[in-house]
Amino acid sequence: MLLIFLGAAALARPAALQARVVVDETGRRVNVPDHPQRLVSLAPSITETLYALGLGDRLVGDTDYCDYPPQAKLKPHVGNVLNPSLEKIVALKPDLVLGIAEANRRQTADQLQRLGIPLYGLTDHTLDDTLRSIADLGRALDCNVAATALEQNLRRRVAEVERRVAGEARPKVLFVVWHQPLTTAGPHTFISDVIHRAGGVSISDDLKSEWPGLTLEAALDRDPDVILFPSHVELSPPLDEIKRLPGWREFRAVKQNRLYVVSESIIHPSPRLIDALEQVAAILHPEAFAMAASDEWRVASDEQQAPGFSSRREGFACSSLATRHLSLTATLTGLPPQQIEAAQ
């Protein structure tokens, strides 16, 4: 009954633009309008990319957790990432909806398709996926010039980082997505990719899960040289508090004071991911970036950032982690676990 009502509402939209069939990053064939003017984003990373491409004026709606840049918070919201409101999406009369396969449910795409609203899906497993998505969005949204310029600039920055860390010894890195229970980033994730390109080795790259849990004992056995936390008050209590947690003081990295809080851009598969790459590389290889690995790189709270990085309190919004791990999903979406379980 709901779909019938929404279908009637969808028919009331303005006459459809001329469209072309494209294959999105998930392999789906999508009827994408030529030069779409009304866009709805179902993921914060997509919202950030649209603004980076200069398309903020075309964005007519996004999710509750799209908070960067600040203008994104002023857009009409269509709900959370896992379970957006179809009614709100239809009411915005979008020409095209943009989503991420790993975060948005296939059911949402299918329902929108039945309503005649195309959804273009992206993927975000690696840093290269993030850069490729910029080019793909440029083609889908008819803004190739801006997309090419942005992608090339970001690739130059990546290449410069890789040039600086080439030949350097690779420290072992534990990235803490969640500290109780301990959850980290496994292989085939953009976080692991950032660590590798920054000249490190993730201690969890041999694990099968993309977002594996680790016992403290297992993490201690892997003996990381460096431990990284994202700058979020819930995920990253003050480092002094971490050091006092049972078992944590046994880490060699703790004894050597090599705990760092890094910018939350590391969990956003958007152009800002390159900011995180540069920061992590400078932490792991300060000599290659003419910086001392001193307390200026240690962030005591999410109100502070390393030099050259935003000091804004960013929401740990959403990424491909969403459907993989309940506690991680709660962190990414800001939803209580009970609500996530109900949505699933």
Descriptions of predicted regions:
Residues A43, A101-E102, V177, L207, ...:
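Short secondary-structure boundary segments
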Residues M1-A10:
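Bacterial N-terminal signal peptides
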Residues V22, R28-R29, L96, R106-T183, ...:
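Extracytoplasmic substrate-binding proteins
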Residues A103-R114, V226-R244:
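A ligand-binding cleft/hinge motif common to bilobed small-molecule-binding domains
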Residues L86-K93, L115, L214-D223:
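Short helices/loops that flank or line small-molecule/ion binding pockets
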Residues A12-A16, A293-L328:
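Short, basic, low-complexity termini and linkers enriched in Ser/Thr/Gly/Pro
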Residues T63, H188-W211, S231, Y260:
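His/Asp/Glu-enriched short active-site or ligand-binding loop at hydrolase and phosphoryl-transfer sites
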Residues R20, Q37-A103, T108, I203, ...:
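A short, structured surface patch at a secondary-structure boundary
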